[in-house]
């Protein structure tokens, strides 16, 4: 995949961080949207 044979750790951290932020954001957005629509 990569020329050096392994993925740099900072790239893994950035991708993992973005993924966590996206999942948490979607979770809270869905929760607030669900509560707002139910009320």
Curated annotation (Swiss-Prot):
Protein name: Photosystem II reaction center protein J
Biological role stated in the UniProt entry: One of the components of the core complex of photosystem II (PSII). PSII is a light-driven water:plastoquinone oxidoreductase that uses light energy to abstract electrons from H(2)O, generating O(2) and a proton gradient subsequently used for ATP formation. It consists of a core antenna complex that captures photons, and an electron transfer chain that converts photonic excitation into a charge separation.
GO biological process entries: photosynthesis
InterPro entries per record: PSII_PsbJ, PSII_PsbJ_sf
Lipid bilayer topology: Single-pass membrane protein
Residue ranges crossing the lipid bilayer per the database entry: 7-27
Cellular localisation: Cellular thylakoid membrane
Top-level taxon of origin: Bacteria
Residues in the signal sequence: none
Subunit description: PSII is composed of 1 copy each of membrane proteins PsbA, PsbB, PsbC, PsbD, PsbE, PsbF, PsbH, PsbI, PsbJ, PsbK, PsbL, PsbM, PsbT, PsbX, PsbY, PsbZ, Psb30/Ycf12, peripheral proteins PsbO, CyanoQ (PsbQ), PsbU, PsbV and a large number of cofactors. It forms dimeric complexes.
Gene Ontology cellular component annotations, sorted alphabetically: photosystem II reaction center; plasma membrane-derived thylakoid membrane
Cross-referenced NCBIfam families: PRK02565.1
Keywords annotated in UniProt: Membrane, Photosynthesis, Photosystem II, Reaction center, Thylakoid, Transmembrane, Transmembrane helix
Pfam families named in the record: PsbJ
Family: Belongs to the PsbJ family.
């Amino acid at each position: 995949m990569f020329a050096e044979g392994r993925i740099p750790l900072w790239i893994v951290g950035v991708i993992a961080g973005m993924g966590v932020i996206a999942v948490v954001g979607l979770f809270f957005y869905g929760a607030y949207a669900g509560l707002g629509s139910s009320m």
